[in-house]
Amino acid sequence: MAASARRASQLLGSAASRLLHARGFAAAAAAAPSPAVFVDKSTRVICQGITGKNGTFHTEQAIEYGTTMVGGVTPKKGGTEHLGLPVFNSVAEAKAETKANASVIYVPPPFAAAAIMEAMEAELDLVVCITEGIPQHDMVKVKAALNKQSKTRLIGPNCPGIIKPGECKIGIMPGYIHKPGRVGIVSRSGTLTYEAVFQTTAVGLGQSTCVGIGGDPFNGTNFVDCLEKFVDDPQTEGIVLIGEIGGTAEEDAAAFIQESKTQKPVVAFIAGLTAPPGRRMGHAGAIVSGGKGTAQDKIKALREAGVTVVESPAKIGSTMFEIFKQRGMLE
């Protein structure tokens, strides 16, 4: 009788302990402030497509960088482990078990839109889709679903991802070129993002957060979404914007910069100055059509908003450094 009483007491104690732990976790989660620009060291990430070649490689890289990777999703492989992380059959299961609030998607193009929708239905705060070549018809449906909700933010698709140097890397960017610092970078081009990162690191300014928004016509996060965050972020003292031909995203960014009256210096580069009309230049969205979306139009709009537009990507870092110097912003 005494033994069974002791056992009951232990079970009750264990249950109470679990309850207190859960309450403590919930309180900590509630107390944690939202990241200034989408991610920080508290971001808990799962990988959709974790057991595939790309998912495996980039999850290893993220773990090595220090990102809080908490699990992965591969249908029919739930209950297994991969890279020391639990694998689940669905995003909803993964979120319930790991308290993840972000996902990165390395899923082949025919299935990527469904993966995005699944992450949205699980109401993750952030979904980063790296996949290139998703059918535009699929992305129209995703965009419509995104616009009907306010819980989930999508970055991408067809993008390098997002990184807060030294804290959280979600995507395919090389971590070692980044340095925690003062410049926020937002770009439609992956490789030009790396160029801007390398240069701002080389001149000693570093980066606050870098966001690759992707080069597809239908993406989840645009220049203005990122600029709003950078303008309000105290760590971001300068902004680099890298655009390209096609669409009106850069003109919208110029209008926002003008309206915001921000005093933070903005340096921009627009790719595709010599692109012939009607020809797609690398990205699905990089096309001048109907006489609209030219580099000249974008450069003009940005300069009228007070942005310093450089003619060559090689000048991004040195130009930002000179502006910091002129304004007495260098320590």
Curated annotation (Swiss-Prot):
Entry's EC annotation: 6.2.1.5
Transit peptide interval: 1-25
Reactions the enzyme catalyzes: succinate + ATP + CoA = succinyl-CoA + ADP + phosphate
SUPFAM superfamilies named in the record: NAD(P)-binding Rossmann-fold domains, Succinyl-CoA synthetase domains
GO cellular component: mitochondrion; succinate-CoA ligase complex (ADP-forming)
Stored SMART domains: CoA_binding (SM00881)
A single GO molecular function term of this UniProt record: succinate-CoA ligase (GDP-forming) activity
Pfam families in the record: CoA_binding, Ligase_CoA
Residues at the catalytic site: H283
Binding site for CoA: T51, G52, K53, N54, K77, I130, T131, E132
UniProt-listed GO biological process terms: tricarboxylic acid cycle
Keyword vocabulary terms for this entry: Ligase, Mitochondrion, Nucleotide-binding, Transit peptide, Tricarboxylic acid cycle
Compartment annotation: Mitochondrion
Cross-referenced InterPro entries: Cit_synth/succinyl-CoA_lig_AS, Citrt_syn/SCS-alpha_CS, CoA-bd, CoA_lig_alpha, NAD(P)-bd_dom_sf, SUCC_ACL_C, Succinyl-CoA_synth-like
Pathway: Carbohydrate metabolism; tricarboxylic acid cycle; succinate from succinyl-CoA (ligase route): step 1/1
Domain of life of the native organism: Eukaryota
Binding site for substrate: Y194
Subunit and interaction comment: Heterodimer of an alpha and a beta subunit.
NCBIfam families: PRK05678.1, sucCoAalpha
Protein family according to the UniProt entry: Belongs to the succinate/malate CoA ligase alpha subunit family.
Function, as annotated: Succinyl-CoA synthetase functions in the citric acid cycle (TCA), coupling the hydrolysis of succinyl-CoA to the synthesis of ATP and thus represents the only step of substrate-level phosphorylation in the TCA. The alpha subunit of the enzyme binds the substrates coenzyme A and phosphate, while succinate binding and nucleotide specificity is provided by the beta subunit.
Classification via HAMAP family: Succ_CoA_alpha
Name of the protein in its database record: Succinate--CoA ligase [ADP-forming] subunit alpha, mitochondrial
